[in-house]
Each structure stands twice: as structure tokens, then as C-alpha cells.
Amino acid sequence: NDFAAALRGYEGIPASAFDADKRGDLLFRRAFCRLNTKDYDGAAAELRQLRADSQYSEHSAYYLAYVDYARGDYDSAEQAFSAIRKNSRFWGEAQFYLCQIDFKKEKYSDVVSAGKDLLDKKLPVEMATELNRMLGESQYHLGNSAEAIGYLTDYVNAVDAPERSALFALGVCEFRKGDYENAKTYVGAVTDADDVMAQSAYLFMGQMYLKDDNLNAAALAFEKAYKMPYDESTRETAFYNYALAQSRGGRTPFSSSVKLFQDFLNKFPNSRYASNVEDYIINSYMTSKDYDNALLCIEALKSPSAKMMKAKQNVLY
């Protein structure tokens, strides 16, 4: 619909040309066009004039609440939507936006509690579809993978371009269930950007390739996750797994493999993986009796641990 063109037409009609009933109709049509062209100030001004209009008072209350929501004033919107009575024609839609507000505020338990009942109500198709997404993502955040999969699958199947957050959540839930093929499809779909979600997606892709024993693909995915600067914890885990995949692949020379672990310790000296990495380095050199390079490796560390210093003493004496 061309709301801008319709608005120009309505603006050319003087309100004084109509009686009270028709004037209210004109004001509402103007306000509705303004809402759809994102002229929220103009829409609110006309909607406020309809508060006392018996034909449009419910419309006024609902759409004024929507104006607050569209502006991002969620506290005011929540108060206004909550004030809409249950016998109003807009009650279901108001409850939908209350769920949206809870979702934006990360009140996932509240979304699930209210959303399940609301899904049984007669909502516009677009709202019901979006409600499935919110319920699915909320269940994902609450750790309820089985419930999340049902809602998110319904959502993804109903839209042409699913939200990346929904695809990622569905992929992670499928991963937790052990359905790695579906997980790859959904998680892989969000690696088309350069952001924190894509970084996490590459980490999951690497883990799934490890399950398939596809070490080269795993290493590539881990490397991409590590090189993205967004989340340091993800970078740490990705670098550790990248080094592991390279060391297990058999195609990386021993010296290069150890160098990767050495770089890891220099970048993440306090890592939860540090002890495992130190064991790998120490055992590798001791097994090969390459004591000179063992010393060089330990001395190259910026902050060698007590374990590494003990290994150094063993080499020296």
C-alpha cells in the first residue's frame, strides 16, 4: 500500500467539511497513514484527538501505545498496552506487544508463560509467526532445546527470510540434540556476516566438523572464529581448538604445531586450557628428547607457569 500517497490525499481534505462522525474517520485514516510512514509525532497528535470519539477510542488507545513501542519507549508502551481491556478488539494484539517488550527486556520466562496461551488466540498471521520466534528463542535462552526446536522450526518454515538469531538458536539446539546435519544448515546460514554471532557460529561449525573427523574443515572454521575480534572467550576457545585440530591433522609439521600452542599460551596465559597446552608442549619435547628446543620454547613464553619452570629445571639438570 502507498500510505504516503494516501496521506497526501487525506491531507487535502479539510476536516471541517465533515460532521463529527466523518471527521473521526478522516483523522484515523490520516493517523494510520502516518504510522505506516513512521511519522509518529503526527500520528500521535491525531490519535489523541480521537480519545473521546466513541467509534475510535479503542483504536486511539492501542495505536498510541504502539507509538510508544515504535519509539523504543518500552516502559510507557508496557503501561499503555497493559491498560487495554480484555473486551477490546485489540486485546490480543496488545498482549503480543507486551510479549515483545518482555522479550526485548530478556524476561524469557515471562515470554514463555504469556506466549503459550497467546498462541492459542486468533492473532494476525504475522504476529503468530513472530510469536513462534520469540517463544523459540526464549526457550533456547532458558536452556529448553526440545521446546525451542518446535517453535523455531515452525517460524523458519513460515517465513522467506528468517531472523539470524532464530537460525543460530535453532542450529545450536539441533547441535545439542546431536543432529549435526541440521545444525550445520542453520548455524552455517549465519556465517555470512562479520559480527559476534558469526564468530560463535564458526566455533560451532568447527566443533561439528570435529565430530565428522573433518580436521581440515574444523581448523578452517576455528581459525575464522579466532580471527574475529568480538568475543574474547570465543577467540580463546577457537584458538585452542584450532591448535588441536592442526596438531591432530598430521599435515602440520611438529615444530609448527608446538609453535601454535606456544602462541596460545602467550596470548592467553591464564586460559582454562593452559594446563592441557603445557602438557602437550612438555610431553612433545620430552618424548622426542629435543631438550634444546624445549628450553627455547619455555624461554619464549611471556609468563611461564610453575609447571613450565619445573620442566625447564628438569631439562637443565
What kind of region is each of these model predictions?
Residues 1-317:
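Acidic, polar-rich low-complexity tracts and alpha-helical solenoid repeat scaffolds
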